[in-house]
Amino acid sequence: MAAATPLLKDELDIVIPTIRNLDFLEMWRPFFQPYHLIIVQDGDPSKIIKVPEGFDYELYNRNDINRILGPKASCISFKDSACRCFGYMVSKKKYIYTIDDDCFVAKDPSGKDINALEQHIKNLLCPSTPHFFNTLYDPYRDGADFVRGYPFSMREGAPTAVSHGLWLNIPDYDAPTQLVKPHERNTRYVDAVMTIPKGTLFPMCGMNLAFDRDLIGPAMYFGLMGDGQPIGRYDDMWAGWCTKVICDHLGLGIKTGLPYIWHSKASNPFVNLKKEYNGIFWQEEIIPFFQAATLPKECTTVQQCYLELSKQVKKKLSSIDPYFTKLGEAMVTWIEAWDELNLLGTTWLSCLSPMVQQRLKSRCY
């Protein structure tokens, strides 16, 4: 009997930012090997990144990014995992799953390996409930349903744009919390998936994240972080705040909870504190900005919504620091680059090295 075809095998790309050899993929081989990988190499482009044999992938370094985007490459962060969003831009698939290279396969309470990708796909293919909270959490999961009192008119739910997974072992803490709790580990496995209610923000983590690129892709910009920027480690959260405002406006849902991955190592809290220092103060003004942000009804596409947000960022956050003027401009550049790359089809292939061209042609064209 033939093995079942993996879910969304030809409709999903796995995006991995990295500065090191990808030995961690061996652990993920049973789950990832059927899918196409987009590897975004950060740091020194002359360094050779080794990928285990048997994986279908394309790899982009900074030289590739500069060739493909030209002057617009300025919107892609350098020396920061925010560079992963370049992979979102060049993907031609409907769905994206992104994972960090220090994330391993976790086990459920029974000791079984968790297929994180499969759970993300299930989350994305089922509706969300952003407009009315179901106290049994996700009513579309096996063994659950809508509770008494849930409006029948809302039971069709909303399309799910984002599936936000969690982590066992090393928690995703900010630097001050890391310093206070250096030995804390997350050992609690909560068997739940829930929709984040409309009007509620959340701190999105990019290390175990999936989304519907067609529904929300242009909003998944991880900002200007890392080299030459006054802030770091806020890339995924910035994208999450923008995405949540846009999802609320467009009637889309975001789920959080399962699946878990095993986060294997803690980053240096002193290095993190230096990166986060400005953000720790700035977020006390950034978050109220997003809580109050509204988009006009004329904004009916993600791009229109994002460009409107960029105007509001420049107008209302630039008083905090000139960085936000630069960020607002980069948001516009990101959308321009996204539209050019996704509307021009294959014309940007000539910018790539012959090896990458061949990989792309054999896969897509």
Curated annotation (Swiss-Prot):
* Glycan attachment sites: 148
**Coiled-coil ranges per UniProt:** none
Catalytic reaction annotation: UDP-beta-L-arabinofuranose = UDP-beta-L-arabinopyranose
Q: Which residues cross the membrane?
A: none
This protein's GO cellular component annotations are: cytosol; extracellular region; Golgi apparatus; plasmodesma
Query: Where is it expressed, tissue-wise?
Result: Expressed in all tissues tested, including root, tuber, leaf, petiole, shoot, stolon and stem.
Q: If you read the UniProt record, what top EC class would you report for this enzyme, in one word? A: isomerase
Tell me the Pfam families matching this sequence. RGP (PF03214)
Q: What does this protein do?
A: Probable UDP-L-arabinose mutase involved in the biosynthesis of cell wall non-cellulosic polysaccharides. Was initially shown to possess an autoglycosylating activity which is dependent on the presence of UDP-glucose and manganese.
Q: What is this protein called?
A: Probable UDP-arabinopyranose mutase 1
Q: From which organism does this entry originate?
A: Solanum tuberosum (Potato)
Source taxonomy: Eukaryota, Viridiplantae, Streptophyta, Embryophyta, Tracheophyta
